[in-house]
Amino acid sequence: MRSRVGNIHMIGIGGSGMSGIAEVLINMGFTVTGSDLAAGAPVKRLLKMGAQVFIGHGADNVNDADVVVKSTAISDDNPELVKARELGIPIIPRAEMLAELMRLRTGIAVAGTHGKTTTTSLLATIFTEAELDPTVIIGGRLNTFGSNARLGDGQFLIAEADESDGSFLCLAPIITVVTNVDKDHLDFYGGQEAIDESFRKFMNSIPFYGMNVVCGDDPGVQRLLPSIKRPCMTYGLNKGNRLRGEILSCEVRSLFKVYLDEKLLGEVSLAQPGKHNVLNALGAIGVSLEAGLDPKVILSGLSNFMGVGRRFEKKGESKGILVVDDYGHHPAEIQATIETAKSCFPQRRLVVAFQPHRFTRTEALFGEFCKTFEKADELLLTEIYPASEDPIPGVNGMSLAQGIRQVSDTKVRFYPDFEMMQNELPNILKPGDLFITQGAGSIYTVGEKFLKYLEEDGEKVLKPEEITAL
């Protein structure tokens, strides 16, 4: 097959899902080229691995391609897609390429509106610790690997399944995880009924001998369970779940007991705090048990989990100001981050810098966003990150700021660009503050530049590994 498919070209190769697939393909021996609008960290990593990456999209980039893979963010009028059609080059979506890779292994697909990346990463850590040598494709950088992908020789392929455009239905996993079913990606689905139907098809697509590991605490999952015709293992914190967690503490670290059919399996100490991370860990435990792993090996693997990039990630501390970055961009995810921050650091003033992600999401969930920041002490809001979307009249950062002020006592400052926010940070942040950069776009650079500013000003900046708290 490699001799027939000489060159795989990937449009949007720097994306979280695409870059992981590209890395696995390179390690399998394929020649990979690609294009993206910027040379971010994933692109730089792929370049070091031998990929040829064009910065910017151009028709000539696909001249030598035998097959073209496109990410969900790429529009049909992209010049590379247009040229590929003219040349008769096969074009496949990212999910179909992932499905082809999954056909070669026993597939484990992790789906859900929130928690996919962390749950997939927990599984990757457990299976690696168990010496199962899995192939892994994740939507974020797993700190243990220093990457979002790895090629293994073992039978399992563990992948994050993207529901945003329904393409996760291309996958053919043996085991699935569904962390939750919430309202999101309404630009594609239109409403909750279509979202539910997509997850219903996903869960019913596994073979009769497979297993759906699903969060029984989630209202969306509860809504679907009566119509699922394939085996299901429920997990959660509530009684009635087959796999149940009992939280002992989730401040600074998460400490909890695990029960299977109300029989104690053991106790877990997870470095990542928060109730949502306990649920993510329970999902990973459920899959691991279904795969036949020894409970002691599973719990040991969880204790060695080092976290995922951009998931409540410590960036540094200086002048008593702790800087944390988090990828969450849905109201439920942001609320989980804020609750975790307040639980871990009740004595610190919480300042959140939030960059909304997509005009369609901001419009569809406007009311929820307005109520999301009530527990923050101060909110620094910037303009919406478009993610290739066209603007929607009346939907912008300023309108969101006004909406938040109407329903919340949280102090809100709006900045049309990062530079204006950056210039004011030294006057806003004080010793003892917790500063969180929040969002799926480039807001993380604000925290990084603030720490660099302090360092250049002569202040000592503690690196993440030097920070004793959390």
From Swiss-Prot:
A Gene Ontology term for the protein's cellular component: cytoplasm
Cross-referenced Pfam families: Mur_ligase, Mur_ligase_C, Mur_ligase_M
Enzyme Commission designation: 6.3.2.8
Pathway in which the depicted protein is active: Cell wall biogenesis; peptidoglycan biosynthesis
GO molecular function: ATP binding; UDP-N-acetylmuramate-L-alanine ligase activity
Keywords from the named record: ATP-binding, Cell cycle, Cell division, Cell shape, Cell wall biogenesis/degradation, Cytoplasm, Ligase, Nucleotide-binding, Peptidoglycan synthesis
UniProt-recorded name of the protein: UDP-N-acetylmuramate--L-alanine ligase
Originating organism: Maridesulfovibrio salexigens (strain ATCC 14822 / DSM 2638 / NCIMB 8403 / VKM B-1763) (Desulfovibrio salexigens)
